[in-house]
From Swiss-Prot:
Keywords carried by this UniProt record: Ribonucleoprotein, Ribosomal protein
Protein family according to the UniProt entry: Belongs to the bacterial ribosomal protein bS16 family.
Species this chain originates from: Lactobacillus johnsonii (strain CNCM I-12250 / La1 / NCC 533)
Protein name as annotated: Small ribosomal subunit protein bS16
Upper classification of the organism: Bacteria, Bacillati, Bacillota, Bacilli, Lactobacillales
Record keyword Ribonucleoprotein present: yes
Highest taxon above the source species: Bacteria
Swiss-Prot/TrEMBL GO biological process terms: translation
Length: 90
C-alpha cells in the first residue's frame, strides 16, 4: 500500500477549499482517507494554511510521499527542510 499526503477538494463550485489528508494512492481524490493533517484555503488573502506538524512528520517518517502541491506548501512552511535536517542529521 503506497501512502500519499495530498489535497482533498472541498467547498462549492468555484470556491475551492482543500483538506490535506493522508490517503492510499489507489483511492480517488475525494475518496476515503486515513487521517486529516491540515487544510488550505486559497481564497483568503493571504492564503490560509494550517498544518499539524507532528502528524505530518510522523507520516513522513513512515514513508508517506507528499504530492507536488503539498510538498510546495510544506516547503513554504519550512517543514521539508526541518524534516530533511532531522533525517540526515544536520
Amino acid at each position: 500500500m503506497s501512502v500519499k499526503i495530498r489535497m482533498r477538494r472541498m467547498g462549492s463550485k468555484r470556491k475551492p477549499f482543500y483538506r490535506i489528508v493522508v490517503a492510499d494512492s489507489r483511492m480517488p481524490r475525494d475518496g476515503r482517507f486515513i487521517e486529516e493533517v491540515g487544510y488550505y484555503n486559497p481564497l483568503t488573502n493571504p492564503d490560509e494554511v494550517k498544518l499539524e506538524e507532528d502528524k505530518i512528520f510522523e507520516w513522513l517518517e513512515k514513508g508517506a510521499q507528499p504530492s507536488d502541491t503539498v510538498r510546495s506548501l510544506l516547503s513554504k512552511a519550512g517543514l521539508m527542510t526541518r524534516y530533511h535536517d532531522a533525517k540526515y542529521g544536520k
